[in-house]
Every structure is written in C-alpha cells, then in structure tokens.
Swiss-Prot record:
It is found in: Nucleus; Cytoplasm. ATP binds at I89, G90, S91, G92, A93, S94, S95, V96, V97, K112. Mostly expressed in leaves, and, to a lower extent, in roots, seedlings, flower buds, flowers and siliques. GO terms for biological process: abscisic acid-activated signaling pathway; defense response to other organism; induced systemic resistance, ethylene mediated signaling pathway; induced systemic resistance, jasmonic acid mediated signaling pathway; response to abscisic acid; response to herbivore; response to wounding. Its EC number is 2.7.12.2. Disruption phenotype: More sensitive to Pseudomonas syringae pv. tomato DC3000 infection. Hypersensitivity to abscisic acid (ABA) in germination and root elongation. Short roots with abnormal twisting (e.g. leftward skewing) in media containing microtubule-disrupting drugs (e.g. oryzalin). Phosphorylation at Ser-235 and Thr-241 by MAP kinase kinase kinases positively regulates kinase activity. Phosphorylated by MAPKKK20. MKK3-MPK6 module plays an important role in the jasmonate signal transduction pathway through the negative regulation of MYC2/JIN1 expression. Activates by phosphorylation the downstream MPK6, MPK7 and MPK8. MKK3-MPK7 module acts as a positive regulator of PR1 gene expression. MKK3-MPK8 module negatively regulates ROS accumulation through controlling expression of the RBOHD gene. Component of the abscisic acid (ABA) signaling pathway that may act as ABA signal transducer in the context of abiotic stresses. Activator of the C group MAP kinases. Activates MPK7 in response to ABA. Changing S235D: Constitutively active. This is Mitogen-activated protein kinase kinase 3. It comes from the Eukaryota.
Length: 520
C-alpha cells in the first residue's frame, strides 16, 4: 500500500478523481482557435505558429498573427470535395481513420478525422500536423498529403499514406507472434525512422506501440500517430509531461520524472518483446495503477533464453534497462547484433505481410472502392469528370462498339462522347449506372481484373448493389426500395484491367472493354 500511495502522490498533479489520469499538462497554454464566417479554422499556437484550414486545404504560416498573410510558408491543396470517403478502418481515443480515394490522382489514402472543439484533441492535431509538415517523405514515417476542414461536422481531416498491410498489432492478432528474422528486418527500418525523429527532428514520440507501427504490402514499415510527440531543443533536453499509452510507458515517465529519447527506446523494447513472444510481459488487465506498480517494482522482463536467440534477448535487455541513461540510442541499436545478424538473409517482408491476411477480402474491397470511384466520376458532376483522364496511361486501351482507343487523350475523348450521350439535354433524360453484379480476380503484382454487370436507369447518381465497401454520400441501394427491372432502360457489361502504380494505393486502368445492350 505504501508504494501505491507514493505513486499517487507523485502523480497527484496529473490525476483527476473523476476522470482518472489526465494529459492536460501537455497542452500549450497559448493554444486557441478562430472560426471565420468563410468556413476557415485558424489554429493558433505560440509554439507552432498558425495553421489555417478550410474545405480547400491547409495553409501553414510562420507568424503567430492570423492577419499577416505575407508570412505564409506552405500550402497543401487537399480539398474535401476531392475525396471519395469510405468506411472506417480504425479509431482511437481522439480520432477516426477512414479509407478514401483522392480523386485528382486516384490514390487510396487514410483520412484521420479529429474534432477541433475539444482542446486536448486540438493540441494533438497541432502536434501531429507540425511533425508531418516538417518531416516530409522520410522512409520511416507515414507520408503526409494534406488536411482540410469540414464545417458541417466540425472536423479536420488529415490525409495520410494508406498503409495497406495494417499494424503490427493487426498482424499479431493473426499470427500470435512474428519470427525473429522478420522482426530484425522490420525493426531495422523502424529504428531508422526513430533515429530520424530523435536525431534530426529532436522529437520524443511518446506513444511507440505495435498499433502505431504500420506496414504496407510492399514490406515497408513506418511509424505513425505523432499526436502526442514532444519537441526538444537539443539532445540533452527533457520532457516533463504525462501522456501516451500507459501500457508501454517507461519507468521514468510513470514516476513523473523528466524524460527524453530513452523513453521511446523502452517502449520500442516492449513492442519487440510482445511481437516476438506473442505476449505482453506485464499483467495489463488489472488497471493502470497496478500495471505501473509492476513496471516500477518488478525486474525488467526478459524473453525465455531457451526459446530465443542470444541476440534477441540482448536487444530486449538493452532497451528495458530501468535506468534511462543505460539504454542505447536508436543509432546504437542499428548496430546491435540482433539487427546486423539477419542483414544478409534479405527477409522478404512483402511476402511475409501478404501471407498474413485473406487476399480474397482485400481484393474484393479494392474492387469495390475502384468501381465506386470510376462510376461516381462517370455519372457525377462535370467539374470532376476531367480527372478521369489521368486514370489512363499512354499504353492504356479502351474498346467499345468494335473500336479501340489507345492513350489517355483518345480514351478520355471516347468516354466523354459516351457520357454526353447518356446524359442527354435535360436532367430527366440522364442515365446512370446501377452495378448489380461485381466479379474480381487478381492480376499481376497488386492489380485486379474487375467485371461489372448492371443496368442503366434514369437518375442523378450511380448506385451499387451488395454489402461491400460503402462510400459516404452514396445511398444504400436497399434503402431506396425500388425495383431495378421496372426502371431499366438498358444494360451494360464492363471489364477493367487495373494495375498498381509505383506508389502504394495508386492505380491506373490498363485495359477497359465496354458493352451496352438494349438502350432505348
């Protein structure tokens, strides 16, 4: 009991009797926001400057004064109306993450949505935006594509690289544990990202855990979720706030002592322990106080030496030193025998990740999203239709009515003629697609062949039958309650050969065949 009382005394500035542990001490006391009549949100922070969000994107300013337009530094054009948003792929305490297709470049992204009216979430948003803006395109961190504000929902959406292999936490749910050679390759690349955060950006992440370590189907692991990271002026500076996931928190942070980069090394060691053994080394289901007492009082956990290599055990032991000064840096860990031992084996991380999850469901989800994207463009507003041209390359082929068109310009012209014919001169004459059947099969490396079969009806919006991926703003076919046969004015069959691009989530149409029958 004495230990418990001592812990509570140490944490008293951070403990709220009604709400439990609070992270309020991490907030910028000068954080505020302004909402203009024009639908622009100005997030202001003495620490970070001004970030202006509206439906057209994000503008980052160097000055802390909103009216100093000449201080504008960077603009990210990522508009809300250019996003085709699908269902949620995850959620956390402060945000929801959804898949989306960015219409201008036809790339699948992850949209992280955050409510701006809660101060703590607003501070986390500022921190994450700042980190992502100042660490562009580093191979160990998820890519940032922009952000925008939606007045109707009061949310700011951050557009991020879509990591289609999920997180290490997702992988553990399927495999229970990850082999050492795979972990060596994974953590080699993750350490490079962490080294960049610490050594170049001078940031303590403060929430390293399997759920925040992502990987794509190309086998590229990356660190995400920078909402509670903290900046330090130099390598000797220290933090003094209590935020992050208690489960992976270092002893010095639990004691409410000042801390620095070694806190992330402890969390990384626990994450590796869990990934390698398949078990979290502490009892985590008896409440946060009990867990923190274990971390403070129990000896640091070590893997069973009879089951794991000496190099793996040594790496874990080095990370989980109670004394933060005794832990190695991320740079030093890159030279650890556990990392260097497997360098010559060239573990194929892409093959490993692709073997984990059901490829059938992944393929079906991809086919659903790309089908919705294409027909929503075709049957949608004219101001977005021109983006369809970039779905094709100069070697793409489109076939219709015995004619073959090659290249993006020819194909777009042919499709525009068909689209104009189906649209008619009056709204009452517009024909739209209803996809009644959708078939798909894999094609090449990451591609898919899609065959859509359906009807034309008079209407103003594309529809798709079935229980697959749903898109925001697209009505459910079941809820409409009408019989397609009674409104059918023609049928169509269309086949698409979709190939993946160089970037994750980027696709183009290599071949397309269209057949229209019984059109009155």
């Amino acid at each position: 009991m004495a230990a418990l009382e001592e812990l509570k005394k140490k944490l008293s500035p951070l403990f709220d009797a009604e709400k439990g542990f609070s992270s309020s001490s991490s907030l910028d006391p000068n954080d505020s926001y302004l909402l203009s009549d024009g639908g622009t949100v100005n997030l202001l922070s003495r620490s970070y400057g001004v970030y202006n969000f509206n439906e057209l994107g994000l503008q980052k300013c160097t000055s802390s004064h909103v009216d100093e337009s000449e201080s504008s530094e960077t603009t990210y054009q990522c508009a809300s109306h250019e996003m085709r948003v699908f269902g949620a792929i995850g959620s956390g305490a402060s945000s929801v993450v959804q898949r989306a297709i960015h219409i201008p470049n036809h790339r699948i992204l992850a949209l992280k949505k955050i409510n701006i009216f809660e101060r703590e979430k607003r501070q986390q948003l500022l921190t994450e935006i700042r980190t992502l803006c100042e660490a562009p395109c580093h191979e160990g961190l998820v890519d940032f594509h922009g952000a925008f504000y939606s007045p109707d929902s009061g949310q700011i959406s951050i557009a991020l690289e879509y990591m289609n292999g999920g997180s290490l936490a997702d992988i553990l749910k399927v495999t229970k544990k990850i082999p050492e050679p795979v972990l060596s390759s994974l953590f080699h690349k993750l350490l490079q990202g962490l080294s960049y955060l610490h050594g170049v950006r001078h940031l303590v992440h403060r929430d390293i855990k399997p759920a925040n370590l992502l990987i794509n189907l190309k086998g590229e692991p990356k660190i995400t979720d920078f909402g509670i990271s903290a900046g330090l002026e130099n390598s000797m500076a220290m933090c003094a706030t209590f935020v992050g996931t208690v489960t992976y928190m270092s002893p010095e942070r639990i004691r409410n002592d000042s801390y620095s980069y070694p806190a992330d090394i402890w969390s990384l060691g626990l994450a590796l322990f869990e990934c390698g053994t398949g078990e979290f080394p502490y009892i985590a289901n008896e409440g946060p106080v009990n867990l923190m007492l274990q971390i403070l009082d129990d000896p640091s956990p070590t893997p069973p030496k009879q089951e794991f290599s000496p190099e793996f055990c040594s790496f874990i032991d080095a990370c989980l030193q109670k004394d933060p000064d005794a832990r190695p840096t991320a740079d030093q860990l890159l030279s650890h025998p556990f990392i260097t031992k497997h360098e010559k084996e060239r573990v194929d991380l892409a093959t490993f990740v692709q073997s984990i999850f059901d490829p059938t469901q992944r393929l079906k989800d991809l086919a659903d999203m790309l089908t919705i994207h294409y027909y929503s463009l075709f049957d949608g507003f004219d101001d977005l239709w021109h983006h369809a041209k970039s779905l094709y390359t100069e070697t793409s082929v489109f076939s219709f009515s015995g004619k073959h068109n090659t290249g993006s310009t020819e194909i777009f012209s042919a499709l525009s003629d068909i689209r104009n014919t189906l649209t008619g001169d009056l709204p009452s004459e517009k024909l739209v697609h209803v996809v009644e059947k959708l078939h798909c099969k894999p094609c090449g490396s990451g591609g898919v062949i899609i065959r859509a079969v359906g009807s034309f009806i008079v209407g103003n919006q594309f529809l798709i039958c079935g229980d697959g991926v749903q898109a925001e703003g697209l009505p459910s076919f079941k809820d409409l309650g009408f019989d397609v046969a009674s409104r059918r004015v023609g049928r169509f069959q269309e086949q698409f050969v979709v190939e993946s691009g160089d970037l994750i989530g980027k696709y183009f149409l290599a071949k397309q065949e269209l057949y229209i029958t019984n059109l009155d």
